[in-house]
């Protein structure tokens, strides 16, 4: 537990202190955000606000993780922790390239769809292949070929190739979902912090009730490799998001950009796979799912009927164009995100209770 607290504290401090440094550097370099034409009127004042703030989140997350390992725990970094951090960083690099092209070309279009998908594909395949390696002494690998809800669903197995395909779909889906949500000051960062806080609790609970515990399996135990290190990653990332939110809250002094949104989406996907909660993540990160679905529904309905289902997609812009103040949309969406996240945590705990009762 001490390692989680130290990692989170370091990440929080680094994020709060490093972000204003990036604001000054990016402002001098002219690394300002371009605004979508559809929202130019309401977001015109945001044009030129420094972007690529996701760099601060990544640096803070890594700093928290490494300092905790160097100062608190005698254990080296684990395969699960490094794989999730590596996936997060790889997608952050894809997002950084996307942001950089937008800035250089002075438009709101960066990498083309093919280049972005290829970047996500490479990161996803590397993660999926490596996550099926590095079995511990009990034969448990960071990820599993089985689909999972709160635990592996043993009757549903993807196989090696199928898991790689599934991982790509999950990682690209979550990274794009967070990217869609990042359209208002602090919306994606605040929501991600809530989801990550839930994953600190989940992974620490899995550590306390692990099937590979030195003193023998706990009641209703979890077959997860490196749960304590996963909790450290989630805690450092959560604190990094909170520190960044200090500067990203409305009115934002900096945006996370695709650097941050793609990285955080990859982080959520990676956490869901290494904790065996892939389907539960859909509930915990429900706001991200709704935002992504609103884009899909808008496209499908428009192509079918030539009419728009929403005033504008993603969903948060629909309410903004309906006359809601931006801060009102953000706070109400945060409330919905918190409800969804807590409901997911409740399902996780209810599953443990139902299985634990069988032993009494």
UniProtKB/Swiss-Prot annotation:
It comes from the Bacteria. GO terms for biological process: cell division; cell wall organization; peptidoglycan biosynthetic process; regulation of cell shape. GO terms for cellular component: plasma membrane. It catalyses: UDP-N-acetyl-alpha-D-muramoyl-L-alanyl-gamma-D-glutamyl-meso-2,6-diaminopimeloyl-D-alanyl-D-alanine + di-trans,octa-cis-undecaprenyl phosphate = di-trans,octa-cis-undecaprenyl diphospho-N-acetyl-alpha-D-muramoyl-L-alanyl-D-glutamyl-meso-2,6-diaminopimeloyl-D-alanyl-D-alanine + UMP. It is found in: Cell membrane. Its EC number is 2.7.8.13. The chain crosses the membrane at residues 3-23, 52-72, 81-101, 115-135, 153-173, 187-207, 230-250, 254-274, 282-302, 333-353. Its cofactor is Mg(2+). Pathway: Cell wall biogenesis; peptidoglycan biosynthesis. InterPro entries: Glycosyl_transferase_4, PNAcMuramoyl-5peptid_Trfase, PNAcMuramoyl-5peptid_Trfase_CS. Belongs to the glycosyltransferase 4 family. MraY subfamily. NCBIfam families: mraY (TIGR00445). Catalyzes the initial step of the lipid cycle reactions in the biosynthesis of the cell wall peptidoglycan: transfers peptidoglycan precursor phospho-MurNAc-pentapeptide from UDP-MurNAc-pentapeptide onto the lipid carrier undecaprenyl phosphate, yielding undecaprenyl-pyrophosphoryl-MurNAc-pentapeptide, known as lipid I. This is Phospho-N-acetylmuramoyl-pentapeptide-transferase. It comes from Saccharopolyspora erythraea (strain ATCC 11635 / DSM 40517 / JCM 4748 / NBRC 13426 / NCIMB 8594 / NRRL 2338).
């Amino acid at each position: 537990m001490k390692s989680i607290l130290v990692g989170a504290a370091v990440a929080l401090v680094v994020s709060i202190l490093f972000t204003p440094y990036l604001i000054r550097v990016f402002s001098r370099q002219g690394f300002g955000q371009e605004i979508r034409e559809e929202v130019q009127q309401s977001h015109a004042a945001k044009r030129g606000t420094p972007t690529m703030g996701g760099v601060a989140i990544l640096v803070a997350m890594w700093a928290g993780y490494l300092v905790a390992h160097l100062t608190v725990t005698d254990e080296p970094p684990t395969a699960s922790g490094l794989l999730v951090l590596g996936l997060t960083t790889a997608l952050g690099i894809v997002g950084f390239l996307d942001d950089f092209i937008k800035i250089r070309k002075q438009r709101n279009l960066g990498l083309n769809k093919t280049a972005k998908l290829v970047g996500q594909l490479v990161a996803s395949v590397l993660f999926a292949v490596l996550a099926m390696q590095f079995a511990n002494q009990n034969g448990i690998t960071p990820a599993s070929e089985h689909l999972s809800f709160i635990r592996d669903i043993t009757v549903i197995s993807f196989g090696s190739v199928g898991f790689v395909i599934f991982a790509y779909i999950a990682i690209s889906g979550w990274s794009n979902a967070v990217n869609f949500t990042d359209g208002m000051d602090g919306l994606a960062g605040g929501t991600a912090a809530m989801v990550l806080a839930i994953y600190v609790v989940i992974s620490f609970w899995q550590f306390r009730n692990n099937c590979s515990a030195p003193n023998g399996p706990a009641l209703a135990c979890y077959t997860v490799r490196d749960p304590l290190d996963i909790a450290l990653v989630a805690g450092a990332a959560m604190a990094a998001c909170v520190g960044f939110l200090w500067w990203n809250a409305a009115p934002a002094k900096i945006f996370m950009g695709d650097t941050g949104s793609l990285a955080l989406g990859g982080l959520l996907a990676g956490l869901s796979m290494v904790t065996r909660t892939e389907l539960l993540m859909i509930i915990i990160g429900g706001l991200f799912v709704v935002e992504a679905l609103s884009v899909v529904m808008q496209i499908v309905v428009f192509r079918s009927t030539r009419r728009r289902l929403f005033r504008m997609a993603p969903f948060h812009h629909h309410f903004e164009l309906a006359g809601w103040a931006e801060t009102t949309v953000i706070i109400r969406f945060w409330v919905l995100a918190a409800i969804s996240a807590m409901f997911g945590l409740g399902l996780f705990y209810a599953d443990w209770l139902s299985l634990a009762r069988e032993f009494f």
